[in-house]
Amino acid sequence: MAKSKTTHPEGGVEKFLVLPIIVLILAQMGTSGDNGALGLANQQLVDVLGATTPDIQLANMVYSLMAGAFMVAGGLVGTIIGWRTNFRLGAALCAAGELVMALSPNMTIFIWGGRILVGFGASFMIPSVLGLIPFIYHGKNRVLAFGCIGAASGLS
């Protein structure tokens, strides 16, 4: 695995890299807050896709079950193929799932196509967020980065 590129200005203090933490925060908030975001779309799901209350409950449940059931496997894959590749794989699966949900003509495809893909993608992204921090940040910056991810989880 490639070493992270860090900048050491005069005095030996490591510069905190902002762009990577922004990407990791957005990934953490996107995956952690997914069910909350779905709750905002309830009325549209009813109006456009003809969703029933059990459909919406199932859509919420399927994401959590997929993400949780494959989380350990997603972390194991990350240790084998590398955290960056694992993160990209998870992001691609999440993007594909979001596209399926956006284009789905009914709740069946929305749930069993889109929500499954997004949950499966999250099972790769969430461990990758935590796995990338030690490769990017060191010392006090690592503590700050983990704190930012914890705050992002709390906000979502």
Residue locations for each model-derived region?
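Transmembrane-helix bundle of Major Facilitator Superfamily
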Residues: 2-156
